[in-house]
C-alpha cells in the first residue's frame, strides 16, 4: 500500500503473465491505484538490493506441504509461498493436480477462496453448480460453500494459483472434508 512499483518483462521474444490480487478492495478505484507514468530506462538501471517492505519468494524455494489424502487432498504438489510462516494473514497457494487427480468435496468455514487456472483442464464444482475449466478461468468460492476439482486429462496436470483470504494457513481456513466426488457429480 502506498508503494510505487512496476513490472518489466526483460525478454523480447516471450510474453509474461502476471497474476495479482487486491485483497479487500471492491474495485480498482478502492485499491488506491495511481498511474505514476511509464517505466523509464533509469527505473530499469536503478540499483536494487531487494524489497524494503513485502515478501518476495520463488516457488522453487518453497517446500511442498504434506497434505492428508484421507482428508480429500490428492494434490501432488501443494506449496504455500505466502502464509503466516512469513507474516501474511492471507495464504497464497500454488497447486498441481496430476492427471486424474481429484481434490474431493470440502469447504472452508473461515475464509473465501479464489483460484486461477494457469494450465490444464478439468471439472470444478461449487455449491450445486459444476463446469468445465481450463487455463484462464478464475473461480471465487464464498466461505462455507462445498467445492471440488477434478483433472480430466490423461497427460497434463492442472496448475492453479490462489488465495485463502484472511487465513494465514490451511488450518485457519476451517477446512472441512465432505466426501468423495461421485460419478454423478462429473456429469455436466
Predicted regions and their residues:
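Hydrophobic, ordered structural segments
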Residues: 1, 6, 16-40
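Short acidic-glycine-tyrosine-enriched beta hairpin
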Residues: 1-2, 128-144
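Short beta-strand His + acidic residue motifs that chelate non-heme Fe in jelly-roll/DSBH
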Residues: 4-12, 104-106, 124-125, 141, ...
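A short hydrophobic beta-strand segment most commonly corresponding to one strand
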Residues: 13-30, 140, 155-174
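A short, N-terminal "cap"/entry segment at the start of jelly-roll beta-barrel domains
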Residues: 29-90, 174-188
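Conserved short histidine dyad/triad with adjacent acidic residue
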Residues: 74-80, 93-108, 143
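A short beta-strand-loop-beta hairpin characteristic of the jelly-roll/cupin
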Residues: 108-135, 174
Amino acid at each position: 500500500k502506498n508503494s510505487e512499483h512496476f513490472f518489466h518483462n526483460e525478454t523480447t521474444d516471450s510474453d509474461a503473465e502476471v497474476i495479482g490480487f487486491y485483497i479487500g478492495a471492491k474495485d480498482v478505484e478502492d485499491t488506491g491505484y495511481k498511474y505514476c507514468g511509464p517505466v523509464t530506462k533509469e527505473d530499469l538501471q536503478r540499483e536494487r538490493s531487494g524489497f524494503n517492505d513485502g515478501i518476495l519468494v520463488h516457488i522453487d524455494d518453497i517446500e511442498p506441504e504434506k497434505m492428508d489424502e484421507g482428508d480429500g487432498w490428492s494434490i501432488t504438489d501443494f506449496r504455500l509461498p505466502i502464509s503466516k510462516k512469513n507474516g501474511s494473514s492471507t495464504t497464497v497457494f500454488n497447486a498441481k493436480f496430476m492427471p486424474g487427480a481429484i481434490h474431493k468435496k470440502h469447504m472452508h468455514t473461515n475464509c473465501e477462496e479464489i483460484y486461477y487456472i494457469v494450465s490444464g483442464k478439468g471439472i470444478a464444482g461449487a455449491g450445486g453448480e459444476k463446469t468445465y475449466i481450463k487455463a484462464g478461468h478464475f473461480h471465487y468460492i464464498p466461505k462455507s460453500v462445498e467445492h471440488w476439482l477434478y483433472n480430466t486429462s490423461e497427460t497434463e496436470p492442472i496448475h492453479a494459483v490462489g488465495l485463502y483470504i484472511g487465513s494465514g494457513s490451511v488450518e485457519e481456513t476451517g477446512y472441512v472434508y465432505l466426501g468423495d466426488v461421485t460419478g454423478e457429480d462429473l456429469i455436466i
